[in-house]
Amino acid sequence: MAVQKSRKSRSRRDMRRSHHHMEVAELSIDATTGEKHRRHHMTKDGFYRGRQLFKASQED
């Protein structure tokens, strides 16, 4: 079984974890509706790249 020779310091542990952060999702603005949405995802209204793929559900 693999066992480390000596304990890793807090500094080395934290340096290793420095890349484990969440990235901010890039947002685009839809040309048709002007609504912000995630890149390569459709808007809540059902628009993607200027076309309406799905009709928006009406919740009352």
From Swiss-Prot:
InterPro entries found in the cross-reference section: Ribosomal_bL32, Ribosomal_bL32_bact, Ribosomal_zn-bd
Biased composition (Basic residues): 1-20
Family matches, as NCBIfam families: rpmF_bact
Record keywords, A-Z: Ribonucleoprotein, Ribosomal protein
Top-level taxon of origin: Bacteria
One annotated GO molecular function: structural constituent of ribosome
Chain spans, region Disordered: 1-60
Protein family: Belongs to the bacterial ribosomal protein bL32 family.
Protein name per UniProt: Large ribosomal subunit protein bL32
CC per GO annotation: large ribosomal subunit
UniProt record, GO biological process: translation
Pfam families hit by this protein: Ribosomal_L32p
